[in-house]
Amino acid sequence: MPLTPPPDFTKVYLSAALGVSLALVVWLLIRSTLPVVGDRDHNLPHGGWYRDGTKSVFYNSPGRLNSIEARKAPLLGQPWAIVVLLVLLIWASHKLGRPNCRACAGSHT
């Protein structure tokens, strides 16, 4: 009985990972995170007013979600500004810090 190598399943795993990734991206793009207001016939996700014979619905529009959407938020309160500031501080401390290696006291550039 000759020895044969085991079958190569890399293409199967790659196809499965690609399919799961594509399904996850599509699900994230099409899902709705808006608050559900109304019933199955009268949906008011962005706010509004509806009235028929026995029913009346008034719903204000959703508020601001976070500091990015706020109009009067301070610049350093913005999440992107904090990230940029931290990146600049790390870069500056690397450039302006000790030029020598702490392990061997040599200069590695």
UniProtKB/Swiss-Prot annotation:
It comes from Potato virus M (strain Russian). The chain crosses the membrane at residues 10-30, 73-93. It is found in: Host endoplasmic reticulum membrane. One of its GO terms (cellular component) is host cell endoplasmic reticulum membrane. One of its GO terms (biological process) is transport of virus in host, cell to cell. Disulfide bonds: none annotated. It holds the Pfam family Plant_vir_prot. InterPro entries: Plant_vir_prot. Residues 1-9, 94-109 are cytoplasmic. Belongs to the Tymovirales TGBp2 protein family. Keywords: Host endoplasmic reticulum, Host membrane, Membrane, Transmembrane, Transmembrane helix, Transport, Viral movement protein. This is Movement protein TGB2. Residues 31-72 are lumenal. Plays a role in viral cell-to-cell propagation, by facilitating genome transport to neighboring plant cells through plasmosdesmata,. TGBp1, TGBp2 and TGBp3 seem to act together for cell-to-cell propagation. TGBp1 is the main movement protein that physically cross the plasmodesma with the viral genome. TGBp2 and TGBp3 would facilitate TGBp1 function. Coiled coil: none annotated.
